Amino acid sequence: MATGKILQITGVVIDAEFPADGLPQIYNALEIPLGEGRSSLICEVQQQLGDSVVRAVAMSTTDGLVRGMDVIDTGAPISVPVGPETLGRVFDVQGRPIDGEGAVGTTKTMPIHRPAPTFEEQSNRAELFETGIKVIDLIAPFTKGGKTGVFGGAGVGKTVIIQELISNIAKEQSGYSVFAGVGERSREGNDLIHEMKDSKIPGTDQTVFDKTVMVFGQMNEPPGARLRVALSALTMAEYFREEGRDVLLFVDNIFRFTQAGSEVSALLGRMPSQVGYQPTLGTEMGELQERITSTKTGSITSLQAVYVPADDYTDPAPATTFAHLDATISLERSISEKGIYPAVDPLASTSRILDPNIVGEEHYRVATEVQRMLQRYKDLQDIIAILGVEELSDDDKLTVSRARKLERFFSQPFGVAEVFTNIPGKYVAVGDTVKSFARVLAGEFDHIPESFFFMKGGIDDVVAAYDASKQ
């Protein structure tokens, strides 16, 4: 292992000189010993500048570094621990436990930079993945082994949907999940860990946390850590996939990955591109997204929260992410303002597998009919605002009445939000969702006021609440 010296420190970017015959390769991890009582600082090589000098980005704070300090080339990229022993643990970008529970009981490690599966290794089966959330399962169904993006501005409920899905999958499907906290609030990460530890899996003494690996590089971390933490989490998920498992990867928030890349790019002296983003935006996103895929041995199903700056979907960061997704779930502020949660816009959300050959004729028919009715209601809203509902034709009055019921029926109580709403969470199977919406469309519940459809699980809950109100 070659040893060099620090030449220059600019924020989190470090220039180091090495012997000509020991120049570190791009993406190699460099180690800077910090002396007594402090763990070493790890940097990642980003550029070879010539004259045996490399430029690297630090994975933690550069406080206390001075020129002339020793830098050791580890000869390999950053590696993280993998295997079942990582379940129920919390890690940082370097794979070091940050939960105070001691060392991880595994010696297996994998580098965070790996090639994506080849065409021959990839699987192209299209299969619906049940989430238990009505609006998602009906309108924008997940693809098993696919990528879904949850788009929304600040405070419309992206993180809550992710928390509910982790909980549902652990309880209903006994699956493993990997959670990457990329540049989000540490408080939310802390809340998530405690909620998962309190959430028991029915019929066992295990909690949801015991089936989840958590990797954090939060807002207070340097941009290098926020840029690489998604790769660390993905590497842990890839191990489970190669062992033949179907694993879930949650990334909250993929926009912060792009944002960190932009910061690193500026520090490395690259010319900024559109709206100040890095010129390598598409390449960086592609390198991450192409690794999130299904192979013939197992699958990684991914859900990514995507912050939309100023609710502008044409911003390069969300626009670049769109290209990689199989399904998009769009959260609208106008829906959350009505108090309807999850605030999913059924007209703006899409899925590649909403196809009669995959989800079945009945599911496809009900989903498209629901969208048609909601679109008609949206078209009529201008007329209603000017003239009032009474001026509509009888057919349009019926459409408006049913559309308002559908809109409220898309709301659903979440288990993870029970402490705020005091309503127990509901998991609704896909079959029940399709049947319930088909019955509402058919007019079977035209006699029930729309308020009874709000915050219910299946249609039986609506009927039960209505019957109870008459007694």
From Swiss-Prot:
<dbReference type="InterPro" id="IPR050053">
    <property type="entry name" value="ATPase_alpha/beta_chains"/>
</dbReference>
<comment type="function">
    <text>Produces ATP from ADP in the presence of a proton gradient across the membrane. The catalytic sites are hosted primarily by the beta subunits.</text>
</comment>
<feature type="binding site">
    <location>
        <begin position="152"/>
        <end position="159"/>
    </location>
    <ligand>
        <name>ATP</name>
    </ligand>
</feature>
<dbReference type="InterPro" id="IPR005722">
    <property type="entry name" value="ATP_synth_F1_bsu"/>
</dbReference>
<dbReference type="GO" id="GO:0016887">
    <property type="term" value="F:ATP hydrolysis activity"/>
</dbReference>
<keyword id="KW-0066">ATP synthesis</keyword>
<protein>
    <recommendedName>
        <fullName>ATP synthase subunit beta</fullName>
        <ecNumber>7.1.2.2</ecNumber>
    </recommendedName>
</protein>
<dbReference type="InterPro" id="IPR003593">
    <property type="entry name" value="AAA+_ATPase"/>
</dbReference>
<keyword id="KW-1003">Cell membrane</keyword>
<dbReference type="Pfam" id="PF00006">
    <property type="entry name" value="ATP-synt_ab"/>
</dbReference>
<keyword id="KW-0375">Hydrogen ion transport</keyword>
<dbReference type="GO" id="GO:0005886">
    <property type="term" value="C:plasma membrane"/>
</dbReference>
<dbReference type="InterPro" id="IPR036121">
    <property type="entry name" value="ATPase_F1/V1/A1_a/bsu_N_sf"/>
</dbReference>
<dbReference type="GO" id="GO:0045259">
    <property type="term" value="C:proton-transporting ATP synthase complex"/>
</dbReference>
<keyword id="KW-0813">Transport</keyword>
<keyword id="KW-1278">Translocase</keyword>
<dbReference type="Pfam" id="PF02874">
    <property type="entry name" value="ATP-synt_ab_N"/>
</dbReference>
<dbReference type="InterPro" id="IPR004100">
    <property type="entry name" value="ATPase_F1/V1/A1_a/bsu_N"/>
</dbReference>
<comment type="similarity">
    <text>Belongs to the ATPase alpha/beta chains family.</text>
</comment>
<dbReference type="InterPro" id="IPR027417">
    <property type="entry name" value="P-loop_NTPase"/>
</dbReference>
<dbReference type="InterPro" id="IPR024034">
    <property type="entry name" value="ATPase_F1/V1_b/a_C"/>
</dbReference>
<keyword id="KW-0547">Nucleotide-binding</keyword>
<dbReference type="GO" id="GO:0005524">
    <property type="term" value="F:ATP binding"/>
</dbReference>
<keyword id="KW-0406">Ion transport</keyword>
<dbReference type="InterPro" id="IPR055190">
    <property type="entry name" value="ATP-synt_VA_C"/>
</dbReference>
<dbReference type="GO" id="GO:0046933">
    <property type="term" value="F:proton-transporting ATP synthase activity, rotational mechanism"/>
</dbReference>
<dbReference type="InterPro" id="IPR020003">
    <property type="entry name" value="ATPase_a/bsu_AS"/>
</dbReference>
<keyword id="KW-0139">CF(1)</keyword>
<dbReference type="Pfam" id="PF22919">
    <property type="entry name" value="ATP-synt_VA_C"/>
</dbReference>
<keyword id="KW-0472">Membrane</keyword>
<comment type="subunit">
    <text>F-type ATPases have 2 components, CF(1) - the catalytic core - and CF(0) - the membrane proton channel. CF(1) has five subunits: alpha(3), beta(3), gamma(1), delta(1), epsilon(1). CF(0) has three main subunits: a(1), b(2) and c(9-12). The alpha and beta chains form an alternating ring which encloses part of the gamma chain. CF(1) is attached to CF(0) by a central stalk formed by the gamma and epsilon chains, while a peripheral stalk is formed by the delta and b chains.</text>
</comment>
<dbReference type="InterPro" id="IPR000194">
    <property type="entry name" value="ATPase_F1/V1/A1_a/bsu_nucl-bd"/>
</dbReference>
<keyword id="KW-0067">ATP-binding</keyword>
